[in-house]
Amino acid sequence: MNAWEVNFDGLVGLTHHYAGLSFGNEASTSHRFQVSNPRLAAKQGLLKMKALADLGFPQAVIPPHERPFIPVLRQLGFSGSDEQVLEKVARQAPHWLSSVSSASPMWVANAATVAPSADTLDGKVHLTVANLNNKFHRSLEAPVTESLLKAIFNEEKKFAIHSALPQVALLGDEGAANHNRLGGHYGEPGIQLFVYGREEGNVSRPSRYPARQTREASEAVARLNQVNPQQVIFAQQNPDVIDQGVFHNDVIAVSNRQVLFCHQQAFARQAQLLANLRSRVNGFMAIEVPATQVSVSDAVSTYLFNSQLLSRDDGSMMLVLPQECREHAGVWGYLNELLAADNPIRELKVFDLRESMANGGGPACLRLRVVLTEEERRAVNPAVMMNDTLFNALNDWVERYYRDRLTAADLADPLLLREGREALDVLSQLLNLGSVYPFQREGGGNG
């Protein structure tokens, strides 16, 4: 059956700031306390979405979350009106204010893990929301992510949305950032590669930085998504590269159809894994980048592998990269050698995503891949699909509501909270989402 990969990109939120909240993510921690530009960040993301849509790649948008997230501050013991809560937390515990104001939901590669209908036992598209429990600021995302996904994939006959796994370390799940699908045409059954960093009883794990994904979580997600057990492989990420800042697998590997583009040190027992894939995926091709050409450190600093590998109609592929790759002589030299070599990658497309990159999120972090048949695509909420009209409407919306300068101190401004709620009210109408945000359901209005 014909099917297409649709990229659902996260729209950067109004409180995008640099707080260094993500231990193990070296870009995040190294840019701590810099001044951010939320308006520019959102527009950079929108330009990528629109450019890819114009090239014929189906593209959609997932909206930001409500931030600062007052309900969690109340759970932490701060009381009074919303404005009083903000004032108290800013004075008594400003680190909590930064956490509940994080714009991290924009990295929707961590929103959920997706199983296309060709791979599932019941023939539905399944999405399991990620619990993201390794980081406090990200663990807050799951309930609203679930509401948003249900508003976008709202046809229950076609889509099954599963709640996040229990919020315990044993079941740490980071979503599609640790998941790859390999195979032939998108509409054919594929092999799902779940990548984990640790498992109970296995001493092989990183020592410097945390392994956020567990094998136990990956196995549970595969069950929830009803993936045919014959189409699943579980593989461990190399603990040594996690300790070098590879906090998700999509920082060291990316797949598309029959191609796996990865660093030669990406996986534990890599030769064994590639042999397994070769035996199970017709025409499988591994493009392994040697450490002698690109070090793990350079891969992390340029986000070479946090790229999008997209199929064109003629069967060739395009690699979507952040500008940092072009600015690194060694990485750019390797990429031009790659273009000249015998493989399906025929084009490099470079985007300026500096605002997201400085917080540790490249092109692949910003998108959730969902393979859909034509019938399934028609069942998606049409208001989120990128086109000229939506692009212009979202740009105008960003221009109206987003600040062009934000520091950690600005997060205590009650006006920022009101601006954000008004903006999300307007956006949820624009995208035909209904009342997906807690402040809407509580009748909080714009106050």
From Swiss-Prot:
Q: What keywords sit in the KW lines?
A: Arginine metabolism, Hydrolase
GO terms, biological process? arginine catabolic process to glutamate; arginine catabolic process to succinate
UniProt entry tagged with the keyword Cytoplasm: no
Top-level division of the source organism's lineage: Bacteria
Report the EC number(s), separated by commas if there are several: 3.5.3.23
Membrane-spanning intervals of the chain: none
Keyword set includes Hydrolase = yes
Q: Where is the active site?
A: E174, H248, C365 (nucleophile)
Binding annotation for substrate: 19-28, 110, 137-138, 212, 250, 359
The catalytic activity, as recorded, is: N(2)-succinyl-L-arginine + 2 H2O + 2 H(+) = N(2)-succinyl-L-ornithine + 2 NH4(+) + CO2
**Pathway involvement of the protein, from the record:** Amino-acid degradation; L-arginine degradation via AST pathway; L-glutamate and succinate from L-arginine: step 2/5
**What PANTHER family does the record tag this protein with?**
N-SUCCINYLARGININE DIHYDROLASE
Query: Which family does the entry's similarity section mention?
Result: Belongs to the succinylarginine dihydrolase family.
Assembly and oligomerization: Homodimer.
Name of the protein this chain belongs to: N-succinylarginine dihydrolase
